[in-house]
Amino acid sequence: MLTYRNEAAFSKALVTAMRAKGFFVQRIESGETGKGIPDLFVITHGVPMWIELKRIHGTCSNKQFLEIPWRPGQQAWLNDVQSRGVTCMTLACYDDGIVKIQAGIYQANRVPQGFGFTKYYKDIRSLLA
């Protein structure tokens, strides 16, 4: 059971773990940037990536679709940048694990489980392994 109260707590734990592994991590303050820009810019092993974070209360296991509360413009931004060759993803933290979602346009913010769109991790340690 993951105990992050909110997205800020999840972000703090994730950024701390990433930096401990030697990643460059920059938190993006979205109030000062364009519409849709993700929460984190990360460089690991010379590879840049953009990561949108979500904290969703409830469980992700045994669901055919995941409902992700992207704000207007977020999916489009991630998909546009991914199409230019930069890795983009959403990390959705649920009570029972973290789901990595590849960038794409998902109808009504619903992501099908499996089919290569998602990957499940039990915690931050397994995500970064």
Per-segment meaning from a language model:
Residues 26, 51, 89-91:
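Hydrophobic/aromatic beta-strand patches that form the interior of the parallel beta-sheet core
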Residues 36:
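Beta-rich catalytic cores
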Residues 57-81:
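Mg2+/Mn2+-dependent nuclease catalytic core
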Residues 1-31, 84:
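Acidic-basic catalytic patches of nuclease active cores, encompassing PD-(D/E)XK
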Residues 40-42, 48-58:
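Conserved catalytic cores of phosphodiester-cleaving nucleases, focusing on short active-site segments
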Residues 99-129:
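Intrinsically disordered, low-complexity terminal regions enriched in charged/polar residues
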Residues 79-108:
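Nucleic-acid nuclease catalytic cores
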